[in-house]
From Swiss-Prot:
Belongs to the FtsZ family. Its main location: cytoplasm. GO terms for molecular function: GTP binding; GTPase activity. It is found in: Cytoplasm. Transmembrane segments: none annotated. Homodimer. Polymerizes to form a dynamic ring structure in a strictly GTP-dependent manner. Interacts directly with several other division proteins. SMART domains: Tubulin, Tubulin_C. GTP binds at residues 37-41, 125-127, 156, 160, 204. Gene3D superfamilies: Tubulin/FtsZ, C-terminal domain, Tubulin/FtsZ, GTPase domain. This is Cell division protein FtsZ.
């Protein structure tokens, strides 16, 4: 069993930077672009979290004041002439025209990128309008594109939700792959008395975990490597992507981490049925038992569709406690809300549900609800809690 002090000294984000900071390491350049207020907030959070040397964070916005305070090394004011740095006023067409006006500046900033991850909050003017245009620009420079987007809270109103859906449909036509994260599902993981600031920070946390999960797979060298070509092959199947990140400690921690990743409630209604490719990336101590790792791999192979291409990767570090495992799972080419099974459906039904927890600032461990619990009306779940 790992002592609490040992766990507190283990920082995955910091380890990510230190372990692969060798100047001789030359990987595929990754650009992460935050679009609009929500996307730029994520970039700010990502910079504070720490990024790999091959990852370039870029903040873009039509709101000059908001952009001015962002710590991103690259900042692009969209539509300087058309908006005057005063924002898009919640009108997607203004956001689109602003991105078109700044197309050359965007193209110059990402010209060497092999992978461009675009993150935004859909429903507003800049994020909804500019993001599809920026995706198209990234495609023009030959980069693979992944859009990681959030959908508005229900309380934000039908008009904003409608704009978000329209923006999502447009993104489907251009982006290689899309990860959709509904804000309402993030809200369900929070304490009942969580503040607005805490909830929005959690939205940023989820976006950062998604971005970091993808970039980690191709920037961390390992005994069993997943490289850019593997990701490119997986993203060749256009459609929605599903991603889960799980951690576990103790006996069979690799298998439990896989189950935790599979049971993540934070992604939108999408179906693993029809997914064309699955990438599984493990991070653990060099002395982690091979048998436990092998059993976790067998578990995934047994539950995945026989025609799905499953690629495994593995990275080891002395900084990770010996019985602790972190796993990132990405399934691509999935269909959204088709009535099929979710990411959880590749778990064996007879397996016990593994409760996920997350440590918050006050030291309290919060239970992250499973998909089954999320089907229970909020008021009923609050009463159960």
């Amino acid at each position: 069993m790992v002592h609490q002090s040992e766990m507190e000294n283990y920082n995955i984000g910091q380890a990510s930077i230190e372990e692969v900071s060798d100047p001789a390491y030359k990987g595929a350049k990754i650009v992460v672009i935050g679009v609009g207020g929500g996307g730029s907030n994520m970039i700010k959070h990502l910079v504070e979290y720490g990024v790999h040397q091959d990852v370039t964070p870029i903040a873009t916005n039509t709101d000059g004041q908001h952009l001015k305070n962002n710590p991103a090394p690259v900042k692009i004011l969209l539509g300087k002439e058309s908006t005057g740095g005063l924002g898009a006023g919640g009108i997607p067409d203004i956001g689109r025209k602003a991105a078109e006006e700044s197309a050359n500046e965007i193209k110059e900033a990402i010209k060497d990128a092999k992978l461009v991850i675009i993150s935004t909050g859909l429903g507003g003017g800049t994020g909804t309008g500019a993001t599809p245009t920026i995706v198209k620009i990234a495609k023009e420079v030959g980069a693979l594109t992944i859009a990681i987007v959030t959908k508005p809270f229900k309380y934000e109103g039908n008009q904003k939700r409608k704009r978000a859906e329209e923006g999502l449909k447009e993104l489907e036509q251009s982006s290689d792959s899309i990860l959709v994260i509904p804000n309402d599902k993030i809200l369900l993981t929070m304490k009942k008395n969580a503040s607005t600031t805490e909830c929005y920070r959690e939205v940023d946390d989820v976006l950062v975990r998604a971005v970091s999960g993808i970039s980690t797979i191709i920037t961390k060298p390992g005994n069993i490597n997943v490289d850019f070509a593997d990701l490119k092959s997986a993203l060749g199947f256009k459609g929605f992507a599903l991603m889960g990140i799980g951690e576990a400690t103790g006996e069979e921690s690799a298998k439990l981490a896989v189950q935790n990743a599979i049971q993540s409630p934070l992604l939108d209604d999408a179906s693993i049925e029809g997914a064309k490719s699955i990438i599984v990336f493990f991070e653990h101590h060099p002395d982690y038992p091979m048998m436990a790792y092998s059993q976790a791999c067998d578990f995934i192979q047994d539950q995945a569709h026989q025609d799905v291409d499953v690629k495994f990767g593995q990275h080891t570090s002395d900084n990770i406690p010996i019985d602790h495992v972190r796993v990132t799972i990405i399934a691509t080419g999935a269909e959204r809300n088709s009535g099929g099974a979710s990411l959880e459906s590749i778990a064996t039904p007879s397996q016990p549900v593994v409760k996920q927890t997350r440590k918050v600032g006050n030291g309290e461990y919060l239970k992250i609800p499973t998909e089954e619990e999320l089907s229970i009306p909020t008021t009923m779940r609050i009463q159960q809690d």
